Amino acid sequence: MPKYLFHVNYVGEGIKGLLKEGGTKRRAAADQAFASLGGSIESMYYAFGDTDLFVIGDMPDQASTVALALTLNASGALTVRTTPLMTMDDMDEASKKSPAYRAPGQ
């Protein structure tokens, strides 16, 4: 199942909700959201800096991943960016492929 890194930032009412509910209840809500689309959360970490929360999760396909991100972003409580993750085997396979390419000016 494809793995993704979700970069989450709380905004406005989302920050107030986090302060009211705490992190554990937000984890339960996130687990439910992922599961409702056939996915699961591998790990979830709060942070401080440019990103409030990092979630590594498995999703069955890109459409489900986009549906999750759209729904979360539409809530207005947070913003979400997704990054597809690759395994070492994926990188090995990619490194064996050689596309035809000419650099600009060459």
Stretches with model-predicted labels:
Residues 1-106:
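A compositional/biophysical signature of low hydrophobicity enriched in polar/charged and small residues
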